Amino acid sequence: MAVQPATITEQLTEPGDTQAPADRRAEFAALLRGDSTRPFLTSAWQHFVGEEYDPVRFATATVNFNRAWDWDWVKINPRAVYYSEAWGSVYDENDYTGVVPRLVSAAVTGVADLAKIRPLDPRTNPALAEHIASARLIREQLPDLALIQTVFSPLSVLLQLAGLPSYPGAEVSGATEQFTRDDLLRTDPELTHAALAAIAQTFADYVALLVAPVDEGGAGLDGIFYAVTGTASGDFFDRQAFEEYSGPYDRKVLEAVGDGQVVFHTCRADSHPEWFTGYPIDALHWDQFLSRNPALDTDFGVTVVGGVNNELFAVGGDRTEVAAQLGATLAASPKRPFLLAPSCTIPTPADPDSLRRLRDAT
């Protein structure tokens, strides 16, 4: 059953006394085209643990956070596991390790289960319909801000479906499966690619709904924040394997954005942002502070995103270093307007003084 939009007006804080321009959506689009008169636009995002499993509460938390800090654009940051929940993976919403709920049961427990991964209708699938509904609610309350929804790559989702990590060296809380990434991907290549194609088709349809106007049944968003998670990091996959298992499926989803905007994220150290310069994307985000990653002023031919190490925003983090990194980023500004943001999701909770330094950067 599709999740129906609800009202969140009574739960929201009032907007602060800001000097926001009348149409930040147009300003965001102009910056991604490279013709903005402003040198950068600023944002940050975090997980709202405890609010993520209800579309109204999640939308309320998202709107309140963005109103409180008056961000120039909004990355909607839903629970990190809704992608695999769409195909039946189960997580304990009351038992988190950090910002990720504990896995109770994976949808894929063996290679044969790949045959069960079929295309889904995002309008009726509970997990996807829930996030379309929450996105509509956020759009209703933030009509003048560019909104982009987080979408994981099909390869990342397939690994998540099997209870396998999508980051080098990571562990999945609650995972019990004994098969490996190679078992999943290489035992039956035909099944593997059929599953990846089904995920890509599902998320292409989902993305098309996210960017469609509300009066046409969509969520009215400006685009997506597309994350390949850590699948391009280090030697997790070499370039040839990445292109086989991720490339065509990434492009399928990205092309569904149409005229919308795509901010593309590749996570962790040695994350190879140069692999993605030929993708249909508008902005490229990587962690400039981790080893073997390029500096933010590297010219990749698209708008770049970055500015401060996300871990510094933890409560008790080094506020002096936040200020120093901001200063260094602004002093060595990229050659074209850019998006000023942390290098990844900021901690929950985050230090308000450090966030204020980011917000007030000029």
Residue ranges and their predicted role:
Residues 2-49, 61, 127-362:
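Active-site loop segments of alpha/beta catalytic cores
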Residues 27-31, 58-62, 81-111:
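Glycine-rich, positively charged N-terminal anion/phosphate-binding segment
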Residues 55-56, 83, 87-88, 319, ...:
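Conserved strand-to-helix beginnings and helix N-cap segments that scaffold or border functional pockets
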Residues 45, 69-73, 87, 96, ...:
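A residue-identity detector for tryptophan
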Residues 97-141:
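A gly/proline- and charged-residue-enriched helix-loop-helix capping module
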Residues 23, 54-55, 107-113, 318:
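Intrinsic-disorder/low-complexity, polar/charged segments
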Residues 54-84:
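Segments that shape or occlude catalytic/ligand-binding pockets
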